[in-house]
């Protein structure tokens, strides 16, 4: 094969690989998003002070989703985050929020990679991932220590395949060995893909925030801690 023919052959392979990889992606899909939905009302309009107990930027993302949902909740008049609440802010409740997320892959991803690549399973099904979120909520009266943390679990079942994973999984079609390389690639595909997290967060943002916000309002109804009028408003440090 002369030089020009070799260049043309390599260019064709590169084009095929890029086209196949880009076509074999699967948009983020949260299969059980509908499971985490609840509606609630409160007998009065609440004012809530939030204490951010997140310990990482990722946890803070989920905390912000909760804050956003409370800010538009029909049972909440006002919500502020400590210690930035105004000195004259007198909340009905103080709620400490600590979200924790655990992301996991699945051994099913091995079989999606091989022999699944033959049917482009990674494109029409996506790889299988889980995101187990546990949000710890502690309710208290202003000026008192928070009560015991109450965990709220939201375990999400998702499907996703980005360009990178689609490219390597599809490589079984254009690499030597009739997909033998996929037998090795499959082990790498088993683990969770961190690149899926931003798309997952965007998809659950509204539903997760609303679910936790409703859980907080339910806590105030189930175990009401009526604000003592003698308690001074929270200062900038709570």
List the predicted regions and their residue ranges.
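Sec-dependent bacterial lipoprotein signal peptides
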Residues: 1-24
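Extended amphipathic secondary-structure runs
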Residues: 140-153, 198-237
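Lipid-handling modules and contact-site tethers
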Residues: 167-210
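Extracytoplasmic/periplasmic, Sec-exported soluble proteins
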Residues: 54-58, 62, 125-129, 192, ...
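Surface-exposed short loop/turn segments
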Residues: 94-149, 156-174
């Amino acid at each position: 094969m002369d030089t020009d023919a070799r260049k043309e052959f390599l260019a064709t392979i590169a084009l095929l690989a890029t086209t196949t990889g880009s076509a074999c992606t699967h948009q983020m899909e949260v299969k059980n998003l509908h499971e985490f939905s609840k509606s609630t009302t409160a007998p009065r309009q609440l004012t809530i002070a939030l204490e951010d107990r997140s310990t990482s930027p990722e946890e803070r993302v989920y905390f912000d989703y909760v804050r956003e949902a409370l800010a538009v909740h029909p049972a909440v008049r006002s919500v502020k985050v400590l210690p930035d609440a105004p000195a004259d802010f007198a909340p009905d409740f103080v709620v400490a929020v600590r979200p924790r997320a655990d992301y996991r892959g699945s051994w099913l991803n091995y079989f999606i990679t091989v022999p699944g690549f033959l049917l482009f399973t990674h494109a029409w099904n996506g790889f299988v991932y889980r995101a187990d979120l546990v949000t710890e909520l502690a309710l208290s009266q202003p000026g008192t220590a928070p009560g015991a943390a109450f965990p709220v679990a939201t375990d999400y079942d998702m499907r996703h395949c980005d360009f990178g994973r689609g490219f390597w999984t599809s490589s079984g079609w254009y690499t030597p060995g009739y997909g033998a390389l996929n037998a090795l690639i499959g082990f790498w595909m088993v683990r969770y893909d961190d690149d899926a997290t931003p798309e997952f967060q965007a998809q659950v943002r509204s539903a997760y925030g609303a679910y936790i916000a409703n859980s907080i309002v339910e806590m105030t109804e189930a175990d009401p801690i009526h604000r003592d009028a003698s308690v001074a408003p929270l200062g900038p440090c709570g």
